[in-house]
Regions:
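Acidic-enriched and Gly/Ser
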Residues: 1-10, 15-67
Length: 67
């Protein structure tokens, strides 16, 4: 299920604009077709989620689809 897209990356913090409201704090998200990029949701606002990367963010790009 597609959750949204990455809108910013700062060190290990990743901001995701949400397409779905089914996301909860503590959920683990990953980049579609790249399971090595996984994040834990730590904060949710009306339209976005702030996540902390569980691995390196090297090679991660803005606009990547998150599921």
């Amino acid at each position: 299920m597609i959750v949204g897209k990455i809108i910013s990356i700062f060190d290990i913090s990743v901001e995701v604009i949400l397409d779905s409201s089914d996301v909860r704090i503590g959920d683990i998200l990953q980049v579609k077709d790249h399971p090595e990029f996984r994040f834990e949701v730590v904060e949710i606002s009306n339209t976005s989620a702030t996540c902390i990367s569980l691995e390196t963010t090297r090679g991660l790009k803005k606009g990547a689809v998150v599921e």
